Amino acid sequence: MDQSDKNPNRRLRVIPKWSELCPDLLRSIFEQLSFTNLNRAKLVCRSWNSASRGCVPKRNQIPWMILFPQKSENNSSNNCVLFVPDDNDKVYKTRDLGVDFAQSICLATYGSWLLMFNHLRNLYILNPLTLERIDLPHSTSINPNMCYPNFKYYRSACLWINNITKDYLVVWPIYNKCFFTKKGDDTWRFAPACHIRMKDQIIYNHKDHKVYQYASYGFIYVWDFSSDIPHVDKHLPAVSFISGREIGDKNKYYRISHQMVMSLSGEVVVVKIMHYYDLSRWRFRIFELNPLTQRWVKVDSLGDAAIILDMGITVVAKDIPGIKKNSIYFSGLNHPLTDPECRFVYDLTTGTMEPLPQCVLSSMLFSDSRWFLPGFTS
């Protein structure tokens, strides 16, 4: 018998460590992975992360939730928690992102990107998955003496970014003025024609370069951002059935609010949100504009689609594990930010709320959260 067969370490020498696998072999495996699984693989070790560069995963179609930390002795302010719905029993903690999230506010999301505003009045775009960061012109270029509102309650802004070229557009209303900046700008530009208030919701449709504004009393204005000087394009009929007032009905008190969403066909729909304070219950109604009558009519079902309210988008949800069709993904928006009952998936078929798993809510003391859709493009 060969004496080498008696050596107990012989097998250890011929079997390589998983962290030392050939990069070409790793890449051939990574290219077969879904977006979610590829991002998991990147976190295994440095060599896997390096080998994954350049790999294009299958397009992600599942909304994720990111939870931002509270300022606490037990919390790290530089890490966030990620929840992926097809991993119902676990959460993921991001690497140190070099950002003090406890003193920052997420104003908007687009794909994997977050539009952040910190206590130093800096705005920047951050990708928590790739660690990429794009610093925007400092807000003092708008007005160095401006007194800023509490953005925990006034988060009217919209973000669009191209994942490859990193071209971007950020539209940011401050009080009764509207400012915007694009890739290559070294300052914020004033849009004098756009009368957008910080309480007004705005969404951006890159396909037609239009910003849609939901203003007071249900008016919807459309602004054209295809040129360097934005201008009003048109306005849609008033959504008269929605208001933002408090309503009392005997012992039941609830608040009506609204959000605009882009449909799969590129049309604006309006989501009516009703919050019953005494019952901790929420209800949602969806309305679309009838092009013939120019009236808003109720939509009974989304069919095989779902709404991600934080992003103002509708996505396909047919036969996709991890996303629920005919549902609305909701994270509370401007409601009490740390209330776990404000984060759920609303089933339009049954009119019920599906809460987040306990592992998500107990993962950290959070100050805010957002649904986002890694890999999304429009």
From Swiss-Prot:
Q: What residues does the F-box domain cover?
A: 16-63
Classification via InterPro entries? F-box-like_dom_sf (IPR036047), F-box_BR-signaling (IPR050942), F-box_dom (IPR001810), KIB1-4_b-propeller (IPR005174)
Could you tell me which SUPFAM superfamilies the record lists for this protein? F-box domain
Pfam families documented for this protein: Beta-prop_KIB1-4 (PF03478), F-box (PF00646)
Under which name does UniProt file this protein? Putative F-box protein At4g17565
PANTHER family tied to this protein: F-BOX DOMAIN-CONTAINING PROTEIN, OS07G0183000 PROTEIN-RELATED
